[in-house]
Each structure stands twice: as C-alpha cells, then as structure tokens.
A protein has these predicted regions:
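Extracytoplasmic/secretory soluble proteins
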Residues: 1-174
Length: 174
C-alpha cells in the first residue's frame, strides 16, 4: 500500500522566539526613550537601580532559569553578540549558540550586570516564583519571556499592587 503525503508550506503567524518586556512607567520616570541598543538598555538598567524605581527591592532585570533549557532567557542577548562573519555553516548546525564566536562577550556583559546587582540575585536557583513575585509586586523593570506568554498576566497583577500607571511594553530593539 502506498501512502501519499501532502504538506502545505506556510508562514506561521508567530515567528518570534522571545519577547523583551520593559516598564514604560520607569522609562517615563527616567525620561528615557525605549532602548534600541545594548548600551542604551544597560544604561536603563543602571538608572533604574540607582533611582530605586521598585523601592529598596528594585530588580532592574528579573531573570529565572528554565529547567528544560537553562540559557533560554539569555539567548536573545547572546544572539545579539554573535559574530556571523566568523560562523561557518558547520558551526551553525553543530554548536550551541553559547559556543559560537561572540557569545563569550555576551556572557561577560551578563556577568558584569549580575555583579552590579542589575540581575536577580537568585536567578540560578529560581524556578520562577521569585521572578514572578518581582514582576507582580513592581520590583522589576525588565524581563524576557516567550512571546505567547499570557499566563500569568503580570500587567494586571502589577497594576493592582503598584498603580494604574505601571505598564509592561514589548521592547523592539534594532
């Protein structure tokens, strides 16, 4: 018996991998535009910490590790540092992004941010409870999440705890 197989090539509605969410109200309080470069993003994180926009428990970058893929939430940052001129076709198919040329610089930056207290202190042992608390209580100013994340709704919960002007927006870096 012969089975015919058909397929329909399609462009999926959602092609985004991760969403970068930033506090609009914090940008307004800092009189800053949405960051479009790594340097502007780091400046925002530093300014948010210095201004203690989330109070004494301010966490500029709320991060957690994903059990199935611990480096998932850093992949957007790592990918932005990759030196595609040095990545071969073989590299692309045989290496993790974390091993590719340029990734080391991304991890140096993340290490610097952690040492400056700009990343959640316990991110490496957080199953999401601490990060979710920081998001809901208004302590955090930035986080990375899957683009289809609709549960829990951090915006509504944060508004209840912080006020109606508290708002997460999707960051679209260039």
């Amino acid at each position: 018996m012969i089975f015919l197989r058909y397929y329909i090539p399609a462009r999926r509605i959602n092609v985004a991998k991760l969403g970068l969410f930033i506090r609009k109200d914090w940008l307004d309080k800092l009189n800053m535009a949405e960051p479009t470069t790594t340097e502007e993003w780091v400046a925002y994180l530093r300014a948010a910490k210095e201004a203690k926009l989330g109070g004494e428990q301010t966490v500029p970058y709320a991060m957690k590790l994903y059990e199935n893929s611990p480096l998932f939430s850093t992949s957007v940052i790592v990918d932005s540092f990759l030196d595609f001129s040095k990545i071969t076709k073989e590299d692309w198919y045989s290496l993790y992004h974390e091993q590719m040329p340029g990734a080391k610089e991304a991890y140096r930056l993340l290490n610097t941010l952690y040492n400056e207290g700009l990343i959640s202190e316990n991110f490496a042992i957080d199953n999401g409870d601490i990060r979710n608390r920081d998001l809901n209580q208004g302590y955090a100013g930035f986080y990375i999440e899957g683009p289809t994340q609709v549960w829990p709704d951090y915006s509504d919960e944060m508004k209840k705890n912080v006020g109606e002007d508290a708002e997460w927006i999707l960051l679209t870096p260039s």
